[in-house]
């Protein structure tokens, strides 16, 4: 659905966005260390594919550690293999989180005597994947890159302290269409950049992945028009309501109580 209607971007604007995000990424990482590695989860979706391409331009493939993390079985793992091969990501690992996830599910059922709600089964794999990325970062030394985009954040298609975690986020303020355009500009295969967005957890009757837009009932293009132009479309109220409900995911700084008088006390 998304690919049928795209916002209009000039070639010059996309070149500028691509150059800016590459330079920003290079500066951020190199400021910490000119030899710093970056760990990225490679799902085969457009976001991780485009961020990997940005990293390649910014710091080179030798400093990228790509990690595939299927949960037992991943229907579209061929796409993540394609990303690794196409970008020449020489440092890559495939760590299956399936056994850890199902063991954890078993422990929760045993101790709580409860069936696990969708909020558990949807978000726990994402949090295990982030734990895996930080594990790799601890072993080899490196930063973990966040690959979330603004459009999917708005509708809640990211997990707090799961895929929405990380040490820096190159595309978090870019819409899906801007991510696609940058991926095209950087020369990624059309099948990767224009892949139907899907969370990988829901299937169609034929066993293929069910797209996000089918489940949402509206397109990311409509979301993007609201983000960039505040256009009052058919699903405007619904999308804005989702945006408000998911705003807490954008603000990763935890709300904290700040005592007002302690400094005065210790100054006495």
Please describe what each predicted stretch is.
Residues 76:
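Conserved Walker A/P-loop ATP-binding site and its immediately adjacent core
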Residues 49-50:
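Phosphate-binding Walker
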Residues 79:
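Catalytic core regions of nucleotide second-messenger enzymes
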Residues 1-40, 53-57, 62-65, 71-73, ...:
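ATP/NTP-dependent adenylation/nucleotidyl-transfer catalytic domains that generate, transfer
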């Amino acid at each position: 659905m998304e690919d049928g209607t795209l916002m209009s971007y000039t070639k010059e604007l996309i070149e500028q966005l691509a150059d800016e995000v590459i330079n920003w990424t290079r500066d951020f990482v190199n400021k910490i260390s000119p030899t710093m590695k970056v760990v990225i989860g490679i799902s085969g979706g457009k976001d991780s594919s485009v961020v990997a391409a940005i990293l390649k331009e910014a710091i080179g493939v030798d400093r990228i550690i790509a990690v595939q993390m299927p949960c037992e079985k991943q229907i579209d793992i061929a796409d993540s293999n394609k990303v690794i091969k196409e970008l020449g990501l020489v440092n890559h690992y495939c760590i299956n989180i399936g056994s850890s996830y199902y063991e954890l599910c078993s422990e929760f059922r045993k101790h709580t005597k409860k069936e696990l709600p969708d909020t558990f089964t949807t978000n726990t794999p994402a949090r295990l994947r982030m734990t895996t990325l930080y594990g790799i970062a601890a072993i080899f030394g490196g930063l973990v890159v966040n690959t979330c985009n603004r459009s999917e954040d708005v509708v809640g298609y990211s997990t707090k302290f799961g895929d929405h975690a990380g040490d820096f986020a190159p595309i978090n303020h870019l819409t899906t269409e801007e991510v696609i355009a940058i991926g095209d500009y950087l020369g990624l295969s059309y099948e990767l950049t224009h892949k139907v967005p899907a969370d990988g957890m829901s299937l169609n009757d034929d066993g293929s992945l069910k797209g996000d837009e089918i489940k949402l009932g509206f397109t990311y293009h409509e979301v993007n028009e609201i983000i960039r132009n505040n256009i009052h479309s058919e699903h405007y109220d619904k999308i804005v309501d989702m945006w408000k409900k998911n705003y807490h995911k954008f603000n990763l700084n935890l709300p904290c109580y700040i005592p007002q008088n302690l400094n005065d006390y210790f100054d006495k």
